[in-house]
Amino acid sequence: DAIDDMQEGLMPSLIEEAGELGLVGASVPEELGGMGLDFKSSMIITEGIGGGHSFAVSYTAHTGIATLPILYYGNEEQKKKYIPGLASGKLKGCYCLTEPSSGSDANSAKSRATLTNDGKHYILNGQKMWITTGGFADILVVFAKIDDDENLSAFILEKDWDGITMNPEEKKMGIKGSSTRQIFFNDVKVPVENLLYERGKGFKIAVNILNVG
């Protein structure tokens, strides 16, 4: 069908339509543009969408692991800037954790961020693998280590920033309509205000979000 044929723009438009129905922001507080439903209600919605195959994968990646890191761990400015767009479906998100050499051992990721001399930006370099919704995401939650830190930190990136590139879509056996990409970061300038939560707390964010998202 059109979804599995990866018709250009179809999946993002379906997420936007779900957003118009309030389904994308079901668990987001009303003051941030969502419906403010409880966890049980969100699960009922997700169960109903579960038969949607490729759409269900894209929907849950966007509403869960892409949106919840900012909703749960973002400061007030970050939430006001990004959550209303994510809750409406006008912005699409992705979660960038896995790397070629770090799958189940996610905290061994090699992506690195270095603070500039003026202290205004982090310069991010690295590669992420098998990123669901990566092909059409506007907002990327990216995990990388700052300098020589032992633990990951988390950052909020925007797709149109210089230095973000990606490979063509992965050729999958199933759920073909759900975008899956490799994403590369080459000297991406990330404003310091886009550090999510606290330095060195990215692994905590990553696993907690996977548990609930």
What residue ranges belong to the model's regions?
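Glycine-rich beta->alpha junctions and the first turn(s) of the following alpha-helix
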Residues: 51-52, 164-213
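N-terminal glycine-rich flavin-associated loop
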Residues: 58-77, 103-106, 115
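A short, Trp-centered hydrophobic/proline-enriched beta-strand micro-motif
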Residues: 89-97
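Buried hydrophobic positions in well-ordered alpha/beta secondary-structure cores of metabolic enzymes
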Residues: 22, 29, 45, 75, ...
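Amphipathic, small/basic residue-rich leader segments at the start of a protein or domain
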Residues: 1-60, 77-88
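Glycine-rich phosphate/pyrophosphate-binding beta-alpha loops
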Residues: 102, 129-135, 175, 211-212
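A short core secondary-structure module
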Residues: 120-166
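Structural signature of FAD isoalloxazine-binding scaffolds in flavoprotein oxidoreductases
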Residues: 36-46, 105-109, 184, 190
